Amino acid sequence: MSIKAFFVDFYGTIVHEDGEVIKKITKIICDTGKVEDPSEVDSFWWRDFQTMFMNSYGETFETQRSLEEKSLVHTLERFGSNADAKELSSMMFAHWIKPPIFEDSKPFFENSPLPVYVVSNIDTSDILQAIAYHDLHPAGVFTSEDAKSYKPGKELFELALRSAGLMPEEVIHIGDSVSSDVQGAAKAGIRALWLNRFGKSVPEGVESISELPEAFAFLSP
């Protein structure tokens, strides 16, 4: 069966992740709290967020904004910082709606011979603003908020398939996360390409590309 569409992740794939903003927030926490090693802040914050993230599903689902703000509050409390959680969160949210874009992203959308659907772990309002900000025109946008489930769960992929009227074998998914994108897509029976922009070691059995337009070569019979 021929490929009829691309699914693509957004943050880290089409646009830059919020790593630089997180560095700034971590520094503020270090400057206002009791921190011996800045890496401790990053580790605690990430683990706390991931714990809530993995338990956010169905009736217990919470938006990405809610999870980020809660994990930030927990991190401020853990390190005795008097910084304002809402103020720090707003720095992240500002990035989410106006993130810098990778140079190959617009050419990918403009030159793709197939429809491109965005499939992302993010709140719907934020990604729609980011897509409009960069004047991108995907065939559809599906978010964790829509599915009430985050990747690497298969629910978001299955929602995208149903909504687009596609079978798993008719889609190639592209994303920058081996766990969320490659393994998550596999759970839904979708072939995935790992977007390895930074030359990392490629895990065995994983198909990878270094730039988005390289995906077009995988459409050849």
Predicted region positions:
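N-terminal helical cap/lid subdomain that shapes the substrate entry/recognition surface
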Residues: I3-E103
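Asp-based, Mg2+/Mn2+-dependent phosphohydrolase catalytic module
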Residues: M1-V8, A83, K106, E110, ...
